């Protein structure tokens, strides 16, 4: 029972923070969808492109967690601050690289087969989110440091505050309240940028100007950037980034295929992504402490508790899958109407709930054992597994079901269970082999 208790103690603040992200996603989709269906469709496409970049960057920042977790497990707190400094530097360089890549995508957005009427809505929203990318990566660096030392509450409160700020900003700027102009989708982007800047500033103030992290601040301030640490972070971070990036690409690239079907399908796809965030973020919230606990026990060379922590995490994932998916299934005919005034969107959302329910087991399985593998720093094989599961299975299956079998958007979504479950099984087999 100690493992379940420890995972819940670490995980619940992360889950609460992620619920804040979910509420923000719901609020964004609700407010944009009721302002304009075209804006909802434009937001769907742009958000999918940025989700790919942000998840890739988040995966890279995860390279810090097993390092900090192992150092913390051994009591080497003096090294942790130095690792954070190198992590923030590495994240900044990655932000520059991703910004250049996304800028190239922006210049070619008209070549991606999206509806012409959506392009004037997509472009300004895209630029504002592009500016915010650096702040996402800096926050990730601070958050993974805090998670690695088992201090998950600070991130929770900052995330919740940022989300409240974003929702209020959305309401004011999308609809033009309190004397502000009615900006629609662009207003949602500006609100997102402001909240992301605020979250980084608050975390930096807590780290540098309070005593909460003073033992780590000394290592941060009194050590220069270190080539060995930088390379170590990259060695762990890039495979995780590739693994998470390919997983997200199976959704983001699917959005391009959905765009070929039309504006209604894109709007339904965005609604389903907002709904799917409920279970995904809860899995993520409980998966992060699996990586932390596993890395702590790995630092102590305690293989038995490494395994017990991972399997306890999987049991929790199964429980979350049940309590998360059941109410969504029961409300499937009502959910679409919460997000859009279009009856066609509502009908399509109800149909997409079925493949969504099917892939919950595979999603929980792959998130849990991906985090367990991160905790033991066995990350390179995950990259190859992700390529097989998402690029060789999920994306081709989506095209086959969606267009060759002519199932449309339902066919595209029916491919996700195949990719996620394949990844989950292969991650489990790898972890089981590593820890025998």
Predicted feature locations:
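Short runs within selected transmembrane alpha-helices of multi-pass transporters and secretion channels
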Residues: 61, 129-147, 155-163, 188-203, ...
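Transmembrane helical elements of multi-pass membrane transporters/channels
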Residues: 9-28, 128, 139, 162, ...
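Small-residue-rich hydrophobic transmembrane alpha-helices
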Residues: 40-103, 136-155, 255, 268-330, ...
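Transmembrane alpha-helix boundary and packing residues in multipass membrane permease domains
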Residues: 14, 18, 29-30, 66, ...
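N-terminal transmembrane alpha-helices
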Residues: 2-30, 34-35, 51-63, 67, ...
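Helix-terminus/linker motif at the lipid-water interface of multi-pass membrane proteins
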Residues: 19, 23-41, 109-116, 172-185, ...
């Amino acid at each position: 029972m100690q493992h379940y208790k420890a995972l819940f103690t670490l995980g619940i603040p992360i889950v609460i923070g992620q619920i804040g992200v979910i509420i923000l996603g719901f609020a964004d989709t609700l407010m944009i969808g009721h302002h304009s269906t075209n804006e909802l469709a434009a937001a769907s496409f742009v958000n999918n492109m940025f989700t790919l970049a942000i998840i890739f960057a988040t995966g890279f920042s995860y390279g810090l967690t097993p390092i900090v977790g192992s150092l913390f497990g051994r009591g080497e707190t003096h090294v942790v601050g130095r690792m954070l400094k190198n992590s923030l530097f590495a994240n900044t360089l990655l932000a520059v690289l991703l910004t250049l890549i996304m800028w190239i995508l922006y210049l070619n957005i008209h070549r991606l087969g999206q509806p012409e009427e959506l392009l004037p809505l997509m472009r300004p929203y895209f630029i504002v989110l592009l500016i915010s990318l650096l702040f996402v990566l800096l926050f990730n660096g601070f958050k993974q440091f805090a998670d690695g030392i088992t201090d998950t509450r600070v991130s929770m409160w900052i995330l919740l505050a940022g989300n409240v700020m974003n929702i209020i900003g959305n309401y004011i700027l999308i609809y033009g309240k309190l004397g502000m102009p009615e900006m629609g989708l662009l207003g949602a982007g500006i609100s997102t940028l402001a909240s992301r800047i605020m979250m980084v500033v608050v975390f930096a103030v807590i780290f540098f100007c309070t005593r909460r992290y003073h033992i780590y601040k000394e290592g941060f301030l009194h050590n220069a950037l270190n080539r060995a640490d930088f390379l170590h972070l990259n060695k762990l971070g890039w495979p995780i980034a590739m693994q998470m990036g390919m997983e997200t690409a199976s959704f983001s690239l699917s959005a391009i295929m959905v765009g070929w079907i039309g504006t209604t399908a894109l709007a339904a796809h965005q609604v389903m992504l907002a709904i799917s965030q409920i279970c995904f973020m809860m899995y993520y919230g409980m998966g992060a402490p699996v990586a932390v606990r596993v890395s702590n026990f790995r630092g102590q060379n305690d293989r038995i508790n490494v395994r017990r922590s991972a399997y306890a995490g999987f049991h929790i994932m199964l429980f979350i899958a049940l309590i998360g998916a059941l109410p969504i299934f029961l409300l499937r005919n009502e959910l679409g109407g919460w997000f859009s005034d279009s009856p066609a969107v509502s009908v399509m959302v109800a149909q997409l709930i079925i493949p969504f329910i099917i892939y919950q087991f595979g999603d929980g399985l792959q998130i849990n054992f991906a985090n367990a593998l991160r905790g033991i720093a066995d990350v390179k094989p995950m990259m190859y597994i992700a390529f097989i599961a998402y690029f060789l299975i999920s994306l081709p299956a989506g095209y086959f079901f969606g267009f060759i079998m002519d199932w449309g958007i339902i066919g595209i979504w029916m491919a996700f269970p195949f990719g996620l479950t394949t990844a989950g099984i292969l991650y489990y087999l790898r972890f089981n082999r590593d820890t025998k």
